[in-house]
From Swiss-Prot:
Residues 165-264, 598-641 are annotated as: Disordered. Transmembrane segments: none annotated. GO terms for cellular component: plasma membrane. This is Endogenous retrovirus group K member 24 Gag polyprotein. A lipid is attached at residue 2 (N-myristoyl glycine). One of its GO terms (biological process) is viral translational frameshifting. InterPro entries: B_retro_matrix, B_retro_matrix_sf, Gag_p24_C, Primate_lentivir_Gag_pol-like, Retrov_capsid_C, Retrov_capsid_N, Retrovr_matrix, Znf_CCHC. A zinc finger (CCHC-type) spans 544-561, 580-597.
Length: 666
């Protein structure tokens, strides 16, 4: 690694010294170790980098791209390499490139003479390098302390040592002239090369203003203080120079201004002078004009309609809000209302907002509801007394009289307000892709849904389906009670039709339903059911009376009086505990007289009586009498019935049985 560092240091010795001096002049200190590490990485991933170095900004941008690609492939690029690369890239931006080329005519006059003499003897490549010597500029020129200016001039401005003259002069307020109109005098060194110690020598002098690019004709001039209440820039305190213009990105006072965007400003200025307002479009602003301009003296000042452009950030926020949250989300509605009521939007502005924010299907919905709202508004304008002179072409921004931006900018305030109301109403009717707007009658509160969420869904559906505001309010108040769950209905019922005038009905309903469905509400309902406590103006108790004491609130089996009597009777009748298990059920230690079991320990059902008698034989009933059985062959020798019963009675188990009446008769 040591040989590699020494090799890199010897290979890029001159280029490294130039970079270090350049960065030091700009107030940035970079160690030689970090620069060598940077060029090691460059030599590894950018083998095309020239040994003598380069001042071309495109080459350093290419280095950054290739280092990023190497990082994506898994190669480790130290953080110090990225920092040093960014600093060097920023330092080389003022140098000559194809994108930011500077002509030779913009250089000082004395430099042009020497340059023209040398270009006759050298090639075109050497000439370009000479041009760079005069127009190159170090970055961050404010930091001028601890710098060897003689060494810096030899490296960056070698030809300036040949020039003779005084040092840089500070231009006072009275001598301020644009740098683009007159070249720098011969022998004058750029202000960025002069130490700031000269400024600190005389502390009693008032502060002076430096000259910066752009030239005076392209600099921003604040409007003067208006007599109609529009404040201008406050004047500078007495005894001080005017406020200096802020420095631009180019800090070299000898370099010409950047031409980036200047063509656009020239076109806009030209169009303003010619009266073409389409070149500087977007929301209209009304500014008062002095009495002498467009109005006679003594008359109130007239207003002038001017267009101001929407910011790109506003359009970007609209697009991202519609994409992430939907066109009718609370965020988008708030943002759209702020834009609609904060600007004087004409029909063309609404179309631009819708096209840039909505999808094609959503824009088609917006346009459809816009046209529908315009037709309804035109009917109202004609039916008004007196009729309002606002037609459909004006509200849509079409037709011969209202198709251009300049024509729409002159619309009256009443038409602007109607366009705003129609477009906001059309925006509210936009549906998200794949979703259909339900009927307000089908929106019902869930059993566990909070009441405010239910009301919000109901209002959203009603706003999309009902156009009239008064009818929408009545429907929402009605459905907020009818479609609520039973718990919320019971809480709202005492308030229905009794809300005082001037109060919001929905707000009172939400207050009444606050806390329903929570743990506290459930505990209160349980306590109410047990004790009959008044809750919400209602008393919930058992419907019947106790058959024992006649009181309301409990049944007979739970009557405290009856339970107290039973305990007293049991204590008086039974003086001792039962000795063993119940002889009836065999399951518990209690007396048989107090046994209430329906089954015994084996699961057999128990009768209601305590003792049972002897089992009885079932009696046969029928239409035919019972005939005794006589074997065949003995039918004629049947003994009389009395003999049969006498033989039976002689048996020991039937000694005491009386004879039947039929046997006695025989």
């Amino acid at each position: 690694m040591g040989q590699t560092k020494s090799k890199i240091k010897s290979k890029y010795a001159s280029y490294l010294s130039f970079i270090k001096i350049l960065l030091k002049r700009g107030g940035v200190k970079v160690s030689t170790k970090n620069l060598i590490k940077l060029f090691q990485i460059i030599e590894q991933f950018c083998p095309w980098f020239p040994e003598q170095g380069t001042l071309d900004l495109k080459d350093w941008k290419r280095i950054g791209k290739e280092l990023k690609q190497a990082g994506r492939k898994g190669n480790i690029i130290p953080l110090t390499v990225w920092n040093d690369w960014a600093i060097i890239k920023a330092a080389l931006e003022p140098f000559q490139t194809e994108e930011d080329s500077v002509s030779v005519s913009d250089a000082p006059g004395s430099c042009l003479i020497d340059c023209n003499e040398k270009t006759r003897k050298k090639s075109q490549k050497e000439t370009e390098s000479l041009h760079c010597e005069y127009v190159a500029e170090p970055v961050m020129a404010q930091s001028t302390q601890n710098v060897d200016y003689n060494q810096l001039q030899e490296v960056i401005y070698p030809e300036t040592l040949k020039l003779e003259g005084k040092g840089p002069e500070l231009v006072g307020p009275s001598e301020s002239k644009p740098r683009g109109t007159s070249p720098l005098p011969a022998g004058q060194v750029p202000v960025t090369l002069q130490p700031q110690k000269q400024v600190k020598e005389n502390k009693t002098q008032p502060p002076v203003a430096y000259q910066y690019w752009p030239p005076a004709e392209l600099q921003y001039r604040p409007p003067p203080e208006s007599q109609y209440g529009y404040p201008g820039m406050p004047p500078a305190p007495q005894g001080r120079a005017p406020y200096p213009q802020p420095p631009t990105r180019r800090l070299n006072p000898t370099a010409p201004p950047s031409r980036q965007g200047s063509e656009l400003h020239e076109i806009i200025d030209k169009s303003r002078k010619e009266g073409d307002t389409e070149a500087w479009q977007f929301p209209v602003t009304l500014e008062p004009m002095p009495p002498g301009e467009g109005a006679q003296e003594g008359e109130p000042p007239t207003v002038e309609a001017r267009y101001k452009s929407f910011s790109i950030k506003m359009l970007k926020d609209m697009k991202e809000g519609v994409k992430q949250y939907g066109p009718n989300s609370p965020y988008m509605r708030t943002l759209l209302d702020s834009i609609a009521y904060g600007h004087r939007l004409i029909p063309y502005d609404w179309e631009i907002l819708a096209k840039s924010s909505l999808s094609p299907s959503q824009f088609l919905q917006f346009k459809t509801w816009w046209i529908d709202g315009v037709q309804e508004q035109v009917r109202r304008n004609r039916a008004a007394n007196p009729p309002v002179n606002i037609d459909a072409d004006q509200l849509l921004g079409i037709g011969q009289n209202w198709s251009t931006i300049s024509q729409q900018a002159l619309m009256q305030n009443e038409a602007i307000e109607q366009v705003r109301a129609i477009c906001l109403r059309a925006w509210e009717k936009i549906q998200d892709p794949g979703s259909a707007c339900p009927s307000f009658n089908t929106v019902r509160q869930g059993s566990k849904e909070p009441y405010p969420d239910f009301v919000a869904r109901l209002q959203d559906v009603a706003q999309k389906s009902i156009a009239d505001e008064k009818a929408r309010k009545v429907i929402v108040e009605l459905m907020a009670y009818e479609n609520a769950n039973p718990e919320c209905q019971s809480a709202i019922k005492p308030l229905k039709g009794k809300v005082p005038a001037g109060s919001d009905v929905i707000s009172e309903y939400v207050k009444a339903c606050d806390g329903i469905g929570g743990a506290m509400h459930k505990a209160m309902l349980m306590a109410q059911a047990i004790t009959g406590v008044v809750l919400g103006g209602q008393v919930r108790t058992f419907g019947g009376k106790c058959y024992n004491c006649g009181q309301i609130g409990h049944l007979k089996k739970n009557c405290p009086v009856l339970n107290k009597q039973n305990i007293t009777i049991q204590a008086t009748t039974t003086g001792r505990e039962p000795p063993d298990l119940c002889p009836r059920c065999k399951k518990g230690k209690h007396w048989a007289s107090q046994c209430r079991s329906k089954f015994d320990k084996n699961g057999q059902p128990l009768s209601g009586n305590e003792q049972r008698g002897q089992p009885q034989a079932p009696q046969q009933t029928g239409a035919f009498p019972i005939q005794p059985f006589v074997p065949q062959g003995f039918q004629g020798q049947q003994p009389p019935l009395s003999q049969v019963f006498q033989g039976i009675s002689q048996l020991p188990q039937y000694n005491n049985c009386p004879l039947p009446q039929a046997a006695v008769q025989q």
